Amino acid sequence: MKISVRNLEPTKVKLTVTVEPEELNPYLDAARKEIAKQVNVPGFRKGHVPGKIIDQRIGFAAVAGEAVNDAVPELYSKALDEKKIRPMAQPEFDVQDVPQSANDETKLKFTATVERRPDIELPEIDGLEIAISKPEVKDEDVDKRLETLRQRFGTLVGVDRPAAKGDFANIDLTAEIDGETVDSQEGVSYELGSNTMLDGLDEALDGLSAGEETTFEGTLEAGEHEGQKATVKVKVNSVKAEELPELDDEFASEASEFDTLDELKADIRKAAAQDAEGRQATEARDAFIAKLQEGLEIPVPKGVKANMVEEQLKGLTPDPEKATKEQKAQAEETVEKDLRDQMVLDALAEKLDVQVSQSDVFNFLASIAQQYGMDPNNFIQAIIKNGQLGSAVQEVARSKGLLAGMRAVKFTADGEVVDLSGFLGEAAEDEESESVEAASAAAAVADELSAKDDAKDAE
């Protein structure tokens, strides 16, 4: 097999693959056997028709067509491995030459155009030192958490005064367009100042007492008249204020397992410190990835970027074409960063020769299944069916590479070494020997088990 590579862009290549007849022959033989299982030829048992008869009765073109369909993807994968090209999207195939008969010496020739990961030269990480901030827990952090807990035990009491920010008003709403009522709601509980309903509602309610009403102009944010201006009439039925408990030992015993307020505060401070350490670990991760990219110009694949931007915009608006310039700019910025981070972590995993084991993949998929309340076997079956197993393996490799890389780096805060072992874990002394292929095989077993379970249920 002869392979030539033409770089179309820094992240896009065109492979031209020429296949020798002896390399294509096994695929032709397999195609003949497969066709023999599907046709009836007088004088021969089904599945036992000689290849020459298949060529004569069915036609060599049909044989070659099936052989090429099987051969091209496999030979393409081999070409990628041989040329060390890491694809980031599906290829575009163009079959140019195909033998026309069993005796035709024409070589199979096809091209594959695909977006690829660019070559990335990472710095040496052994001995690398990265400065990060020191986690701090201030008194106001503790007070803020304590106030949040206090609000959970607050009660609403009716007040005989005009509504103000922070109060809860029970209201009736009626929206009209050109004098016609298009929407109405009764008995809605609304917190003044929350700005969670119509624009202008907070201003309209401010200063109103129970029994009073007013009108204002607002833009409807839901329903068939979404986006249209309407005249909104709002009536206040009642006004309630939040009454919070006193911060004392009685509150501490009611709101927690502690008997005194001092004990509760100490526990809150401890939790705040743990959260601060978690934020420090996140900062360390981000700083490490940024350090790997320092001074590097990493291009991103245009097609992959465009698809990811479109998917992100779909989460913001039903029609991505109607997204605002700000939304598009933000989506592009986010996607570019995510792509560069992913490509750098992929390169790091290769540099560190990260091995992805069967248990790594199963644990990863099982944890996701648990998050969604799904059976692990059924979840793995869905992953395989959707062709996402490779992506799962890639995610595991990135994660393992990131942890291994961060363990090799010294992180400091105010000149002192930071111990992140609680987040990074310890490097395994004995890595399991299972390969990525073993993970695929294991997932296939899970797929088979799940299929058997479905068959039993159907009986």
UniProtKB/Swiss-Prot annotation:
Superkingdom of source: Bacteria
One Pfam family recorded for the sequence: FKBP_C
Keyword Isomerase: yes
Protein name: Trigger factor
Protein family according to the UniProt entry: Belongs to the FKBP-type PPIase family. Tig subfamily.
Disulfide topology: none
Recorded GO CC terms: cytoplasm
GO terms of biological process kind: 'de novo' cotranslational protein folding; cell division; chaperone-mediated protein folding; protein transport; protein unfolding
PROSITE patterns attached to this UniProt entry: FKBP_PPIASE
Swiss-Prot/TrEMBL keywords: Cell cycle, Cell division, Chaperone, Cytoplasm, Isomerase, Rotamase
Biological role stated in the UniProt entry: Involved in protein export. Acts as a chaperone by maintaining the newly synthesized protein in an open conformation. Functions as a peptidyl-prolyl cis-trans isomerase.
EC number(s) stated in the UniProt entry for this protein: 5.2.1.8
Subcellular location field: Cytoplasm
Organism: Bifidobacterium longum subsp. infantis (strain ATCC 15697 / DSM 20088 / JCM 1222 / NCTC 11817 / S12)
Limits of the PPIase FKBP-type domain: 166-245
